[in-house]
From Swiss-Prot:
Its EC number is 1.1.1.1. This is Alcohol dehydrogenase. PANTHER family: 15-HYDROXYPROSTAGLANDIN DEHYDROGENASE [NAD(+)], ALCOHOL DEHYDROGENASE-RELATED. It catalyses: a primary alcohol + NAD(+) = an aldehyde + NADH + H(+); a secondary alcohol + NAD(+) = a ketone + NADH + H(+). Keywords: NAD, Oxidoreductase. It comes from Drosophila grimshawi. Homodimer. Substrate binds at S138. One of its GO terms (biological process) is alcohol metabolic process. Gene3D superfamilies: NAD(P)-binding Rossmann-like Domain. GO terms for cellular component: cytoplasm. The keyword NADP does not apply.
């Protein structure tokens, strides 16, 4: 996918990985970058606008845990303004296994709902033009960090959902791939709660392992966007971008 002159919606585009990725996207010259985030950050929006004045940056407050109908309403506002959208990035995520329901709501249900909502505008069965979904999942969707089983399971669910959406592309016209960062130096991993307090030092122990910067992750994210490979399972770890070959242990046969 060519980012230049495209229209992109980025959910949680002002977070740790999100903000650096927004910067890299803006440098590539899209026509519009629409940022949806729970918390407004005027300074970050101003920085993005200054980075490339030719790009129109728009912000809308958005919490991915709202009902599906509210998400559809917001997307209608965006589509009415832009007419077309080329790429949806779902990047919302929390890491706190004390908040079981919210972890599932943000990391999984929110991704499902935003993707489902945009199908109203993209689905070729409804006369839509199709589109591309990039879902930020996690390497914990491959192999869990067992001290945070709720977080890990939510990311595995998001990965499975994304893979299924990709396989439906011939029906809907919507392609999809997953972005799976490894341990990245963000506020998210500096301090977080394990499930039932099974490992109070989990954040400290995790950061003893090799990590990557948000910039390294963002630069590889843009490479994945440009590759635009339907069904790809991208691992973004230690400053590298690698396509994962998923091992098939069972097939529904349908």
């Amino acid at each position: 996918m060519v980012i230049a002159n495209s229209n992109i919606i980025f959910v949680a585009g002002l977070g740790g990985i999100g903000l650096d990725t927004s910067r890299e996207i803006v440098k590539s010259g899209p026509k519009n970058l629409v940022v949806l985030d729970r918390v407004d950050n005027p300074a970050a929006i101003a920085e993005l606008k200054a980075l490339n004045p030719k790009v129109t940056i728009t912000f809308y407050p958005y919490d991915v845990t709202v009902p599906l109908a509210e998400t559809k309403k917001l997307l209608k506002t965006i589509f009415d303004k832009l007419k077309t959208v080329d790429l949806l990035i779902n990047g919302a995520g929390i890491l706190d296994d004390n908040q079981i329901e919210r972890t599932i709501a943000v990391n999984f249900t929110g991704t499902v709902n935003t993707t489902t909502a945009i199908l109203d505008f993209w689905d070729k069965r409804k006369g839509g033009p199709g589109g591309v979904v990039a879902n930020i999942c996690s390497v914990t969707g491959f192999n869990s960090i067992y001290q945070v089983p709720v977080y890990s399971a939510s990311k595995a669910a998001a990965l499975s959902f994304t893979t299924s959406i990709a396989k439906l592309a011939h029906i809907t016209g919507v392609t999809a791939y997953s972005i799976n960062p490894g341990i990245t130096k963000t506020v998210l991993v500096h301090k977080f709660n394990s499930w039932l307090g099974v490992e109070p030092r989990v954040a400290e122990l995790l950061l003893e392992h090799p990590t990557q910067t948000t910039l390294q992750c963002a630069q590889n994210f843009v490479k994945a966007i440009e590759a635009n490979q339907n069904g790809a399972i991208w691992k973004l770890d230690l400053g590298r971008l690698d396509a994962i070959e998923w091992t098939k242990h069972w097939d529904s046969g349908i």
